[in-house]
Amino acid sequence: MNQLDGIKQFTTVVADSGDIESIRHYQPQDATTNPSLLLKAAGLEQYGHLIEDAIAWGKKHGGTQEQQVAAASDKLAVNFGAEILKSIPGRVSTEVDARLSFDKEKSIEKARHLVGLYQQQGIDKSRILIKLAATWEGIRAAGQLEKEGINCNLTLLFSFAQARACAEAGVYLISPFVGRIYDWYQARSPLEPYVVEEDPGVKSVRNIYDYFKQHRYETIVMGASFRRTEQILALTGCDRLTISPNLLKELKEKEEPVIRKLVPSSQMFHRPTSMTEAEFRWEHNQDAMAVEKLSEGIRLFAVDQRKLEDLLAAKL
């Protein structure tokens, strides 16, 4: 049995890609997209029809060019998501514009709009996850959306405070980042020789997983942002793992046994009182890595969102 199939015995595998052909090839349960992945996929010739449809939608929407571009951009994200859903049995994650990361109300409005666009294509909200950055405002927005039956995936999650706040808000799923945490520490104090058990990104996800299971939080933990297969194998047993096509390929080509590493704890603890906004901001602020990586992640997604909009504007 190859390692990918071995992991699938213990963990739901999700494809971290906007490339529909790759998704079909690796047969994941779910798929995640973001502006960076959509920008990459939009440059591929085989997806030209999805872009043309989004452009036509933007023109039909009317208004200023800026409004038409915004309409086309939302439609493009949904077009990719709808196409991906034809190839997977589960859900696709579609991201809210990163520039709304500090605006609770506009994030809620955008999420409802994206769900509405999916519903116009006959796709039920039960097959969609709305991705939001795990800022305090994003977490509050997600808490409200969950009450409306719109499930959310909280991304750019680097600190334990972010994870705990998401669980306390009743968020459906979180995406703690492994690789970007590893990158930050590796740039400052390289882990040489590399020992996966000491990888700070792996340790972060393990701690979150254990805490959620011990306190009976139902929020799904989906490890994300991997740099090497060792990180993935060390988190086998995590609820879900979202993996890029190049690492899915590596795992599929290796015929080695896979051992479950994460197992729900039999120890149970009472849940603490929910964090206040001030407590969340203080705890998150204590983690220099998390503060830096969350800010950087939002900026990078915003840059790629603008590039995507420039690409669409040139065609309008």
Swiss-Prot record:
Keywords on record: Cytoplasm, Pentose shunt, Schiff base, Transferase
Gene (name only): tal2
Any GO BP: carbohydrate metabolic process
Matching NCBIfam families: PRK12346.1 (NF009001), talAB (TIGR00874)
Active site positions: K131 (schiff-base intermediate with substrate)
EC numbers for this chain: 2.2.1.2
Subcellular locations according to the entry: Cytoplasm
Subunit structure of this chain's protein: Homodimer.
GO molecular function terms listed in the Swiss-Prot or TrEMBL record: transaldolase activity
Top-tier EC class: transferase
Coiled-coil segments: none
Protein name: Transaldolase 2
Main location: cytoplasm
Pfam families: TAL_FSA
Pathway: Carbohydrate degradation; pentose phosphate pathway; D-glyceraldehyde 3-phosphate and beta-D-fructose 6-phosphate from D-ribose 5-phosphate and D-xylulose 5-phosphate (non-oxidative stage): step 2/3
Family in the record: Belongs to the transaldolase family. Type 1 subfamily.
Catalytic function, reaction form: D-sedoheptulose 7-phosphate + D-glyceraldehyde 3-phosphate = D-erythrose 4-phosphate + beta-D-fructose 6-phosphate
Function: Transaldolase is important for the balance of metabolites in the pentose-phosphate pathway.
Keyword Transferase: yes
Cited InterPro entries: Aldolase_TIM, TAL/FSA, Transaldolase_1, Transaldolase_AS
Gene Ontology cellular-component annotations: cytosol
PROSITE patterns cross-referenced by the UniProt entry: TRANSALDOLASE_1
